[in-house]
């Protein structure tokens, strides 16, 4: 049936940033850092690395730098995070050399600064960060943060 009048467009807004608890010990999280949940203690975040079974948590929106002596138990400190699955498009550094043909490809945690294509990473399960939506240069792209289909 064709529209004969304007209709109300209903949408859900993207998730808002949220505070996540940080692992214990010496931690320096920079603004823009990719964060993973700690593998052995889900619920606490740390700077991301490409390790099997780690789960991407989001991108840090604030800096946190604490010494081990001041951070003796998990959850003492929190950091503001743009969460996994937020739907936002974020300009990201890509470890691999990419081309416009990579638009639509998934990218995964490479480290706290970069994402990578599946061929260059170990963790292609929980490490999914998002989908390349726009090629910018050989090592830079707009990436849409998406929820992992199995999480």
Please give the residue ranges for each predicted region.
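Surface-exposed, low-hydrophobicity beta-strand/loop segments enriched in small/polar/acidic residues
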Residues: 1-151
